[in-house]
Every structure is written in structure tokens, then in C-alpha cells.
């Protein structure tokens, strides 16, 4: 049954995510009965032993595609930050629209939409609306600052492309490396990243030892290691700089 469930999950990755979800604290909208929550929860962001931020997320899927929503909150003394994002994907896992909003410390927002061979980002600086074009296909993966759940979506794409079905679940060749084109709307920059399967590892999280699948994510801005559990959900990320992200 586990294999069947995983194959359904990865089929959703090809048809990936139509996620319709509501950020934490927002008024819940009426949902289409055919929509299904694929993943939901929260991540703690740690610098050393100190928790510095929390991301709350939902991934939902329906016949029209997927929606990934996320809310990021950070409070360090008087410095408070609050942002939210919404990523909508078509059934073929192509970008329909991406929006992020900052409520604190300043109010700003940006939207990315496809336009033929371009992706167009519209963003505000002060009261001025700006526009920037990127010569990128709609298959480009959004990897924005602060929203770690988007790395799970990228991981599912990797699983679909690099791994195959086995009796015990999915088989991923160790050392198999794939490249993906990405866009970071916060930085208004694009880059290629690579993911490589690092094998199975025993990792202790919240005092409990688990056997997890390790992957290495590399890009121009730095390297991350991340771990997926047996349900192929992101449970841990660690940056070279020492930042760690843990599922609550």
C-alpha cells in the first residue's frame, strides 16, 4: 500500500499539486470536495540552538492543478518579519501564478505570471509598480527566500524524474544528479540548481532516531542538505552556514 500511495503522490507531481489552502489565521474558504491536502504543517528555523522563525504551510491538490501556500513569521527582539506566499501550478506542474506579500516590517508584494516565452515579475518599490521580464519557461521552479516548503515541491520533481518503483518503495540511484532552472522572486534572479541523492541516513530529530533519505541541493548562493521521510515529506534542511530547518 505504501508503494501505491507514493506512486499516487508522484503522479500528483507530474499532475503536481493543485493546492488550495489558506494561510494560518486567515478565514477558511469553501473548498472543492475533489481537492485533497497533500501536506500541511510547520517548520521551525534555527540558528544554533535558537528558534528564530516559523513557517506554516499547506499543499493541496485538485483536478485543476495544485496550490502551495505558506506563511513565514520571525521575531528577534524588536525585529519582526511576516510574509506569505501562494504558488499555483497547472496539472502539468507548470507555473500559473506566484504571489508573495510582506506585511512586516514593510508592506510590499510581488507577482510572477507567464507570458508566452517569458515570466513577468511585477513588484512594488515604495508606491511605484515595477516590471521585470525573465526569459524562462513555465516549467521553471519557484525557489523563493523564506518559504522552505517550495524545496519539497522541487524534491518531488526530482523523485519523479530520477527514481523508479521498487517493491520496497521508490529506488533512487545514489549520486544521481539532476539540474533544475529556478527563479527567486525576492532577489529577482534566476539560476540553475542541482539535486543529488546521498543515500539513506539515520538522523535524530526531536529526540527520535529515524532512517531518512538524504539529498544535496547545490546552487550559486550556497549548498543545502535536506532529508525526506518514508512518506517523501521534507523533515529537515541544513545549510553550510549553519541554519537548520526542522519539521515540527
What are the functions of these language-model segments?
Residues 1-5:
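Positively charged n-region of N-terminal signal peptides that target proteins for export
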Residues 8-19:
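Bacterial N-terminal signal peptides
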Residues 23-28:
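Boundary at the C-terminal end of the N-terminal hydrophobic targeting segment
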Residues 35-45:
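A short, Trp-centered hydrophobic/proline-enriched beta-strand micro-motif
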Residues 36-38, 52, 105-211, 238:
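Solvent-exposed helix/loop surface patches that form functional interfaces
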Residues 38-39, 82-83, 196-197, 220-222:
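Short, small/polar residue-rich loop motifs at catalytic or cofactor-binding pockets
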Residues 46-129, 232-238:
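N-terminal mature ectodomain segment of secretory-pathway/periplasmic proteins
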Residues 218, 224-241:
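Short, exposed beta-strand-loop hairpins at the edges of beta-sheets
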